[in-house]
Amino acid sequence: MSVVPAANIDEAGAFGELTALLEKESDIDLVLLDLSMPGVSGFSGLIYLRAQYPAIPVVVVSASDDGDTIRRSMEFGASGFIPKRFGVETLREAIGKVMNGDVWTPSDVDLSAGVDPDMAKLRDRLITLTPQQVRVLMMLSEGLLNKQIAYELGVSEATIKAHVSAILQKLGVESRTQAVIVAAKISGNQWRQNEPSA
């Protein structure tokens, strides 16, 4: 049974496949994003998609359905949050609401609870990053060196150094390690899956 009758559904097994699909297809109306999708570290994928494709609504689908995760997803620009434990009917309802311009979250979640002013300030800094800077920060969080990041992104090492400098300035920190710590604070333990190497 199709969740959305008459819809064309494309699937991506990893975040890189998703971004390639978004670059290739111009008629995508909605993205369902799993926070634990390969290639994503917590909210980094959501932040990247909202920066790169602001016109395409993103609905987070996740097994992590605590109030804090849902609130942070919405703060970072998700149009909805659907816990994986919900059935097809709920998924259909949520997608319908989002496609009509509304937002959807579980009714038992208070989106205004637990807002930490310090976290809000850090979040505000993080969302000033460009999509490429978000990608670089994701890779820094994985412990990659500038040379490795440059190779992965197909740019020069000097370009990566410039991105890292801009990231440090925008986040108000002095080192790569501090930038990764800020990113980890913003999304709890969900931003970073691997500790950066020394």
Label for each model-derived stretch:
Residues G143-Q178:
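Recognition helix of helix-turn-helix DNA-binding domains
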Residues A14, S41-S44:
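Acidic catalytic/metal-coordinating carboxylates
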Residues P38:
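The feature encodes the CheY-like receiver
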Residues F43-A55:
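Short amphipathic alpha-helix used as the core "switch/output" element in two-component signaling
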Residues M1-D10:
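Two-component/phosphorelay signaling modules centered on CheY-like receiver
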Residues D34-L35, S62:
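Active-site residues of response regulator receiver
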Residues I70-M74, G80-R125, S187-G188:
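Short, flexible helix-to-coil linker/hinge segments that flank and couple to helix-turn-helix
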Residues L168-A198:
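Basic, Lys/Arg-enriched C-terminal extension of HTH/homeodomain DNA-binding domains
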